[in-house]
Amino acid sequence: MSSSRPAHSSSSSSRTRQSSQARILAQTTLDAELNAEYEESGDSFDYSKLVEAQRSTPSEQQGRSGKVIAYLQHIQRGKLIQPFGCLLALDEKSFRVIAFSENAPEMLTTVSHAVPNVDDPPKLGIGTNVRSLFTDPGATALQKALGFADVSLLNPILVQCKTSGKPFYAIVHRATGCLVVDFEPVKPTEFPATAAGALQSYKLAAKAISKIQSLPGGSMEALCNTVVKEVFELTGYDRVMAYKFHEDEHGEVFAEITKPGIEPYLGLHYPATDIPQAARFLFMKNKVRMICDCRAKSVKIIEDEALSIDISLCGSTLRAPHSCHLQYMENMNSIASLVMAVVVNENEEDDEPGPEQPPQQQKKKRLWGLIVCHHESPRYVPFPLRYACEFLAQVFAVHVNKEFELEKQIREKSILRMQTMLSDMLFKEASPLSIVSGSPNIMDLVKCDGAALLYGDKVWRLQTAPTESQIRDIAFWLSEVHGDSTGLSTDSLQDAGYPGAASLGDMICGMAVAKITSKDILFWFRSHTAAEIKWGGAKHDPSDKDDNRRMHPRLSFKAFLEVVKMKSLPWSDYEMDAIHSLQLILRGTLNDALKPVQASGLDNQIGDLKLDGLAELQAVTSEMVRLMETATVPILAVDGNGLVNGWNQKVAELSGLRVDEAIGRHILTLVEDSSVSIVQRMLYLALQGKEEKEVRFELKTHGSKRDDGPVILVVNACASRDLHDHVVGVCFVAQDMTVHKLVMDKFTRVEGDYKAIIHNPNPLIPPIFGADQFGWCSEWNVAMTKLTGWHRDEVIDKMLLGEVFDSSNASCLLKSKDDFVRLCIIINSALAGEEAENAPFGLFDRNGKYIECLLSVNRKVNADGVVTGVFCFIHVPSDDLQHALHVQQASEQTAQRRLKAFSYMRHAINKPLSGMLYSRETLKSTGLNEEQMRQVHVADSCHRQLNKILADLDQDNITDKSSCLDLDMAEFVLEDVVVSAVSQVLIGCQGKGIRVACNLPERFMKQKVYGDGIRLQQILSDFLFVSVKFSPVGGSVDISSKLTKNSIGENLHLIDFELRIKHQGAGVPAEILSQMYEEDNKEPSEEGLSLLVSRNLLRLMNGNIRHIREAGMSTFILTAELAAAPSAVGQ
């Protein structure tokens, strides 16, 4: 579908990328224009000009590239820093100073009387060797940063000045051709002057992280409210906000907490220009930004004159803010600020790495929003606390990603359900009027304020929609301007160029269009954005006279409302996909009536689907049974009542309980008392379809194993389902952790020489690695080398988080940045005393093979009880267990594919059926003779039978006696049923030369009865089909009947209906008959399944089926109870 916005591509993700890139480029141009205007105007700058700027057309925005380049250069290479620290730029080869801030000599080289023996204090200037400024430990640590690809892993580095003895945090980042180092004074009263490292910073955020992780999920609002509350308590700022960017780049204060007496900004929307694109780019590079005092005078940077380009300050926290931003802060009385970027995954399905390949390229990221802290007085936050806030923002981003996935699933399910309901309404009436006049209707498909349908030169309107004449005018405009497109979406009819937009007012701003034909069109309408937005902040007191040129949040909000005055909320990609899907269904429904139906091709597709699906499922099922019986891991299964119906040899060996002794016993009697509630919960959830993973419980031992103590299992609960996805039991795939736990217990008790255990090549020793309290890898045993391919000397003394494990540029690659954040949380929690056990973990080994495992982390303490690091134990499931899980997954995927295929086929069949119905209805009005009309009626009956069968696909278990197969009672003539049923086997009879003889009396054929004629027709056709299939070539099939009337009262008669179908030959195989009578527990054949369903239908009619086999002949005897139709009483 086309759009008034930049052209859309075929996929949602590419459409999003293109429109987003176009918006960013346009916004950057506007940012540069406004910046130039501000610099030239100074105090006379009129802030309201951004309204006119954002309304300017693309042609008016051309010719500004020079301003854009100058603006970006000024933002990134401004040569000014904030005065709370100083800055040095070092040449990477010589380690000499090539640039320094004007305050650096005073901060780093001033002589202190507390430091003796400083005869010749060092001087700081261009070319100074930085080793001369600091004591040896700090200078060595700084020089070590030269060899690191990612120098940020070392931050902060603690250094001490030679002259004053003052400690500083050195925060290093790499710029083009040099290292840029921020130096921030350490305040011993606030933080201990030790090389704390990143792990110590994680501790500061532990409480906040735990609070976020404990949230149930499903509410973005609750998640944002929690994070602002935790940051508020962690940092002590006066105001903390969660600031969210919308699709059109404008921002919204989504959550907020303030100290008492401060005006709230909750619900306030800002124009996109309030946070320029250049600033957003810098937030992607440097995810924490601090401004200590907006009134403080910036400090200049002195650079080596030999430098060809100014040094980039993108990664520096000290980078001075732009004067325009400082003015804005001053106006809103925010003297200090701290901002954390919230970076999330792009919504692109194609970027997901495969399960067995390392992620060669990280998933694309985007800036979701910011966590913004404001303070009404100068405020400095030390680096360790800023780092903790950055990590907290990363954890928050992981949960935002989860919320997106959950919202996407809920949204897709809702849209799919609505599409299905609308499709069903369409197929019943084959007219688009049904989805406008009925309930639900097209307004329920996507969020809108009104809708309309132009069909057959008539107009139908729903709620807030233009008048009939206006809709016709819009349709004419579409045909003239967008005649070649199949539709259009715009958030502003005015911007899209519709000449009548002004007459529509602000209640009709946005529109989405789907063309069914060139003259038949569906419309959706939206009102202006302001109607959707409410500011939750303080109301504006009319006595407050705001200067319209003064930069302030209230004026930002006013400017935003002006910008979006004639705009609606934008139409999202998923909404346009839903509209496009409905458009295709409508076009198919109306157009297929005019196209010939490829019935034979459809039959072949269905046949191939059944054969492929059954063969695959049978193979998978056989493999599952074999695996369960022979697996070297414990596997047990229970039915829906908790009774054991599966107990393999491995679990029998571990527990001492034989298979025959375990079968039939309740699972709760076989587990330790301490595990009863755990297993009970697992069983309950699994039967509801909620499968728990990595749950530990203890199994009782019996016989010779009784004295060995309980068996400790870590179990995955898998719901056992039938072909119709109905949960019929639970399978527990387990891993024996008894020996593993004994080793871990013994290990954690050892206080002295533990290396003998760690480096023992005994296969019982699991892979173990460890880190000291500063995050350096300190342990890596033989089993770990075998698992990963990385030797001990290649990882020891490297940063565990960042160099050994990371999602890029590390020895052991993780799948994603989210996985890296989770590993950080686990290790941090262990250092804080919350040890992790059997957490799901995965990594790529040296050869790129992905390893799924469990991770347990324990803290390491010395004799004084001081935490000195962590030990991490990895447990890898056996090959048999992994194979079993993969087979189970394949089975589930096959069942899902089959269900999806059947759902598609059902959907696809309805469209040609609608076309056939239209064709027959047209034929009836062409003057057919009696015989031709009779054939048309037979086709109608067969059509209704097929519709009935398609509707049965909704049944969970169609073969169950208690299934919800229903009867639709109506009057019919038995002749119509018999003729329609026989017609369904005549082609098969002709192919085998079989004669069908209907020896039915006139009285039977003309009898009018009351019941479900279509179901009876289905039953007869099933038994006739089987009879013809198992008759010899040249044989015969004879149909005879008997009717017996029984009077019940004066005007009610019941008819005992009996029909006999006799055919020659050996007859139907006994196996199929056993399946019909449910005497065979094997998977039923197609014929057995159809006869079983027909038998259940006969039972609903108070009837049954019998089969008689005689010499050379077989007979089906069908009985049912019908009511004589009122018009037939007395005949």
UniProtKB/Swiss-Prot annotation:
<dbReference type="GO" id="GO:0042803">
    <property type="term" value="F:protein homodimerization activity"/>
</dbReference>
<dbReference type="InterPro" id="IPR036890">
    <property type="entry name" value="HATPase_C_sf"/>
</dbReference>
<comment type="similarity">
    <text>Belongs to the phytochrome family.</text>
</comment>
<keyword id="KW-0675">Receptor</keyword>
<dbReference type="InterPro" id="IPR012129">
    <property type="entry name" value="Phytochrome_A-E"/>
</dbReference>
<dbReference type="GO" id="GO:0006355">
    <property type="term" value="P:regulation of DNA-templated transcription"/>
</dbReference>
<keyword id="KW-0804">Transcription</keyword>
<dbReference type="Pfam" id="PF01590">
    <property type="entry name" value="GAF"/>
</dbReference>
<comment type="subunit">
    <text>Homodimer.</text>
</comment>
<dbReference type="GO" id="GO:0000155">
    <property type="term" value="F:phosphorelay sensor kinase activity"/>
</dbReference>
<dbReference type="InterPro" id="IPR003661">
    <property type="entry name" value="HisK_dim/P_dom"/>
</dbReference>
<dbReference type="InterPro" id="IPR035965">
    <property type="entry name" value="PAS-like_dom_sf"/>
</dbReference>
<feature type="region of interest" description="Disordered">
    <location>
        <begin position="1"/>
        <end position="26"/>
    </location>
</feature>
<dbReference type="InterPro" id="IPR000014">
    <property type="entry name" value="PAS"/>
</dbReference>
<dbReference type="Pfam" id="PF08446">
    <property type="entry name" value="PAS_2"/>
</dbReference>
<dbReference type="InterPro" id="IPR003018">
    <property type="entry name" value="GAF"/>
</dbReference>
<dbReference type="GO" id="GO:0009881">
    <property type="term" value="F:photoreceptor activity"/>
</dbReference>
<keyword id="KW-0677">Repeat</keyword>
<comment type="function">
    <text>Regulatory photoreceptor which exists in two forms that are reversibly interconvertible by light: the Pr form that absorbs maximally in the red region of the spectrum and the Pfr form that absorbs maximally in the far-red region. Photoconversion of Pr to Pfr induces an array of morphogenic responses, whereas reconversion of Pfr to Pr cancels the induction of those responses. Pfr controls the expression of a number of nuclear genes including those encoding the small subunit of ribulose-bisphosphate carboxylase, chlorophyll A/B binding protein, protochlorophyllide reductase, rRNA, etc.</text>
</comment>
<dbReference type="InterPro" id="IPR001294">
    <property type="entry name" value="Phytochrome"/>
</dbReference>
<dbReference type="GO" id="GO:0009585">
    <property type="term" value="P:red, far-red light phototransduction"/>
</dbReference>
<dbReference type="InterPro" id="IPR016132">
    <property type="entry name" value="Phyto_chromo_attachment"/>
</dbReference>
<keyword id="KW-0157">Chromophore</keyword>
<dbReference type="Pfam" id="PF00989">
    <property type="entry name" value="PAS"/>
</dbReference>
<dbReference type="InterPro" id="IPR013516">
    <property type="entry name" value="Phyto_chromo_BS"/>
</dbReference>
<feature type="domain" description="PAS 1">
    <location>
        <begin position="620"/>
        <end position="690"/>
    </location>
</feature>
<feature type="domain" description="PAS 2">
    <location>
        <begin position="750"/>
        <end position="834"/>
    </location>
</feature>
<dbReference type="Pfam" id="PF00512">
    <property type="entry name" value="HisKA"/>
</dbReference>
<dbReference type="InterPro" id="IPR013767">
    <property type="entry name" value="PAS_fold"/>
</dbReference>
<dbReference type="InterPro" id="IPR013654">
    <property type="entry name" value="PAS_2"/>
</dbReference>
<keyword id="KW-0805">Transcription regulation</keyword>
<dbReference type="Pfam" id="PF00360">
    <property type="entry name" value="PHY"/>
</dbReference>
<keyword id="KW-0600">Photoreceptor protein</keyword>
<dbReference type="GO" id="GO:0009584">
    <property type="term" value="P:detection of visible light"/>
</dbReference>
<dbReference type="InterPro" id="IPR005467">
    <property type="entry name" value="His_kinase_dom"/>
</dbReference>
<feature type="binding site" description="covalent">
    <location>
        <position position="324"/>
    </location>
    <ligand>
        <name>phytochromobilin</name>
    </ligand>
</feature>
<feature type="domain" description="GAF">
    <location>
        <begin position="219"/>
        <end position="404"/>
    </location>
</feature>
<dbReference type="InterPro" id="IPR013515">
    <property type="entry name" value="Phytochrome_cen-reg"/>
</dbReference>
<dbReference type="InterPro" id="IPR029016">
    <property type="entry name" value="GAF-like_dom_sf"/>
</dbReference>
<dbReference type="InterPro" id="IPR043150">
    <property type="entry name" value="Phytochrome_PHY_sf"/>
</dbReference>
<keyword id="KW-0716">Sensory transduction</keyword>
<dbReference type="Pfam" id="PF02518">
    <property type="entry name" value="HATPase_c"/>
</dbReference>
